[in-house]
UniProtKB/Swiss-Prot annotation:
Residue ranges of domain Protein kinase in the record: 148-401
Name listed for the protein in its UniProt record: Aurora kinase
A GO term, aspect molecular function: ATP binding
SUPFAM superfamilies membership: Protein kinase-like (PK-like)
Function: Component of the chromosomal passenger complex (CPC), a complex that acts as a key regulator of chromosome segregation and cytokinesis. Has a role in error-correction of aberrent kinetochore-microtubule attachments to ensure that sister kinetochores become bioriented and connect to opposite poles by promoting spindle assembly checkpoint signaling.
Gene3D superfamilies per the UniProt record, alphabetical: Transferase(Phosphotransferase) domain 1
EC number: 2.7.11.1
Biological source species: Debaryomyces hansenii (strain ATCC 36239 / CBS 767 / BCRC 21394 / JCM 1990 / NBRC 0083 / IGC 2968) (Yeast)
Main subcellular location of this protein, as a coarse class: nucleus
Reactions listed under catalytic activity: L-seryl-[protein] + ATP = O-phospho-L-seryl-[protein] + ADP + H(+); L-threonyl-[protein] + ATP = O-phospho-L-threonyl-[protein] + ADP + H(+)
InterPro entries in the record: Aur-like, Kinase-like_dom_sf, Prot_kinase_dom, Ser/Thr_kinase_AS
Length: 412
């Protein structure tokens, strides 16, 4: 029954959100209004993204203006990631994180092995909500905050907070992202927020984080998200500085699997980076954050123009304001591979304008300690011409991947 509730209620809330937001513009305040109980569960965080309500895709006015003055890793839009604070994880015993041999964080996972199917979202943005209402179970129409026990804060961001929660009826542990409607309205995020939910709620893959549904009240919107016990991969990379070949190849292979699934579904992620990769048990990754994602067939002649993502991961075609397609994810996979092995993105500079120039020229400097096979894969991924970039199938069958598989942990 719990599965059905989460499958259906998100679809109904999805298509009534924008109307509700417009009606209640004067009824918001900045307070989240959550009462925290003493429940110690640890899920993870998610984020939203930005776009104009009047147009599906609008260009960002200026790359320089959209970035902060520092060289911090921030998205180009008007939103900010909610980060999972890995240092605040309650350290229990039993299970261990194994990003590499140099780091072990003992934790015990309360997550259930089997998840629940997300909502099947219709492609058309408009639909008859009255007809849908007749098909929904009554419980899904009245989901409220009272249905959950609220635990500790897992992350904070410009748009809200992520809490650890337990569904009272089922006992299911999840993450609850809380965003104020007023902030969504002020930042003109309603439509992009809706598109993000439409995309992610319809994705079912072991390497992609699940969105189970969402509900709202007069002040806030609540996203119910999959629990990932070890948080963002970025935090593990910061602690270890860089991953060894066995660990990095395992992660790259899994991200390639996730991207292959997305591209088959005609979805471009457009924001691949360590912050958007979550770590579950047995070194299993979960690709998350679909705020910049769009539907766009790889075989289609339709190209995108929106500049989006994170500066260090932008491909040359975006830097030069050219059209782009699904191959931007291939480029980002190359940046990701380099950062895993070296500890920083390949074109990172203190001055962002210098970063722009290095990306445009593909001014790639390969450290001498990288293996020849890893170097070959990175060079094949980071081709300036999108047509020359290696395919995901070739990535997964590359010698660097194949030769390191024997060192990967067994996944249950």
């Amino acid at each position: 029954m719990y599965c059905r509730v989460f499958t259906h209620f998100s679809l109904y809330r999805l298509y009534t959100l924008s109307d509700n937001i417009n009606i209640n513009k004067t009824n918001h305040n900045k307070s989240i209004g959550l009462h925290q109980h003493r429940v110690n569960y640890m899920p993870r965080s998610m984020t939203a993204s930005s776009s104009q309500l009047k147009r599906i895709e609008t260009r960002i006015e200026s790359l320089s203006e959209s970035l902060s003055k520092s060289n911090a890793r921030k998205p180009l839009g008007k939103f900010q990631l909610n980060t999972f604070d890995n240092n605040k994880i309650t350290k229990l015993q039993n299970e261990k994180v194994r990003p590499s041999k140099s780091s072990h964080i003992p934790v015990k996972s309360p997550i259930r092995k089997k998840g629940h199917s997300p909502a099947q979202v219709l492609q058309n943005e408009r639909m008859d909500t009255k007809l849908l209402l007749q098909k929904l179970p009554s419980a899904s129409r009245h989901m409220t905050l009272d249905d959950f026990e609220i635990g500790k804060v897992l992350g904070k961001g410009k748009l809200g907070k992520v809490y650890c929660v337990k569904h009272k009826t089922s006992g299911y542990i999840a993450a609850l992202k809380v965003m104020a409607k007023k902030d969504l309205i002020d930042l003109k995020l309603e439509k992009n927020f809706r598109r993000e939910i439409e995309i992610q709620s319809n994705l079912i893959h072991p390497k992609i984080s699940r969105l189970y549904g969402f509900f709202y009240d007069h002040k806030n919107v609540y996203l119910i998200l999959e629990y990932s016990i070890h948080g963002e991969l970025y935090h593990h990379l910061k602690v270890q500085r860089r991953f060894n070949d066995a660990t990095a190849s395992h992660y790259i292979y899994q991200v390639a699997l996730a991207l292959d699934y997305l591209h088959t579904k005609h979805i471009i992620h457009r924001d691949i980076k360590p912050e958007n990769i979550l770590l579950s048990t047995d070194n299993c990754i979960k690709l998350s954050d679909f705020g910049w994602s769009v539907k766009s067939s790889p075989s289609s002649s339709t190209k995108r123009l929106t500049i989006c993502g994170t500066l260090d991961y932008l491909p040359p075609e975006m830097i030069e304001s050219n059209e782009h397609d699904y191959t931007v994810d291939i480029w980002s996979l190359g940046i990701l591979c380099y950062e895993f092995l070296v500890g920083k993105p390949p074109f990172e500079e203190i001055d962002k304008n210098s970063t722009y120039k290095r990306i445009a020229k593909v001014d790639l400097k390969i450290p001498s300690f990288l293996s020849s096979e890893a170097t070959d894969l990175i060079l094949r991924l980071l081709q300036k011409s999108p047509k020359k970039r290696i395919t995901l199938a070739e990535v997964m069958n590359h010698p660097w991947i194949m030769n390191n598989q024997q060192y990967w942990p067994n996944e249950n």
